[in-house]
Amino acid sequence: MNLYERLFEFVSTRTYRNRVLKEHDAIAGIIGRIAGDIDICRILGYEAAMIGDRRNKPYGKPIISENVVGRIRNIKDFVSDRAVDAFGKAMDVLGPYGPDRNWDIEKHWRDIKIVQLWMGGKQLCQMEAARYFFNCETL
């Protein structure tokens, strides 16, 4: 199960003051932001796949250039930051169940942190983005 499914199950079944958690304003705001982050990250993931899969022929080799790498790394940087934030908020909502290894939220959070460090980390992604968007040559 992924983050959305675990969080949906938790806020739909747990109650606080005779109301399910998802009906409280504070929790609804947090889970609404998490749902938006998940949706935006999914769309950007498809966009990155489409950018990286451009070909000059239907079955030719992908066209990879510095511009493509810069755009994909920029998307990776943004999406991994939003995912870490979403997992942190979800662990806050889940309370003591958030870091519990039986719920797998903590494992997914660790995996996202590894993805954040993958391909050189945040600074390298920012330098690639600056190189692409602002034509920096000395970075």
Q: Residue locations for each model-derived region?
A:
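Alpha-helical interface subdomain recognition
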Residues: 1-139
